[in-house]
């Protein structure tokens, strides 16, 4: 009997693995039980990382490319357009106005329905980190 959790379309499995081989092995193991995958920066930056995203989409999977883009608006626009043209369902960017505007403009220019997710604060930041970068607490 298959668990409902493993067939729930809301479940996104993170391919936060160190190698393409391990990521592909996980996808093979999970087979048709999972319909959505997140590919993080480590795999996306490896040779074949973006190709893996395309392979998953070709298999009918929903693909979340977790780039967390953060640069000047024009650069984010170009990167978001490239990601959108290549096929992506969800794309992360940092939640700064020029970054988000650039991402939406690039996505739209790419003729895609890619959803843009804005990261407001990295969960890895401690209170001390936030104070150091100017977000002090009273």
Model regions and ranges:
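Generic structural signal for well-ordered alpha-helices
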Residues: 24-27, 50-53, 80, 100-104
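Catalytic domains of carbohydrate-active enzymes, especially glycoside hydrolases
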Residues: 29-38, 86
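Short, small-residue-enriched loops and turns at beta-alpha junctions
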Residues: 19-21, 42-46, 69-74, 123-126
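Conserved anion-binding
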Residues: 5-9, 71, 75-138
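Hydrophobic faces of well-ordered beta-strands that scaffold small-molecule active sites
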Residues: 9-15, 35-39, 63-67, 91-93, ...
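N-terminal amphipathic alpha-helix/helix-capping segment at the start of soluble metabolic enzymes
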Residues: 1-28, 57
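Active-site cofactor/substrate anionic-group-binding motifs, chiefly glycine-
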Residues: 38-41, 52-72
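Surface-exposed amphipathic alpha-helices with a cationic face
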Residues: 31, 53-58, 104-111
């Amino acid at each position: 009997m298959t668990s409902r959790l493993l067939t729930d379309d809301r479940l996104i499995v993170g391919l936060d693995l160190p190698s393409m081989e391990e990521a592909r092995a996980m996808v093979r193991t999970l087979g048709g039980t999972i319909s959505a995958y997140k590919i993080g920066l480590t795999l996306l930056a490896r040779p074949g990382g973006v190709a893996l995203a395309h392979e998953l989409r070709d298999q009918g999977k929903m693909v979340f490319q977790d780039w967390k883009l953060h640069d000047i608006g024009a650069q984010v626009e170009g990167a978001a357009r490239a990601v959108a043209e290549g096929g992506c369902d969800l794309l992360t960017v940092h939640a700064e106005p020029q970054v988000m505007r650039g991402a939406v403009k690039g996505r739209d220019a790419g003729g895609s329905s890619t959803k843009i997710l804005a990261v407001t604060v990295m969960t890895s930041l401690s209170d001390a980190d936030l104070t150091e970068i100017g977000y002090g607490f009273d």
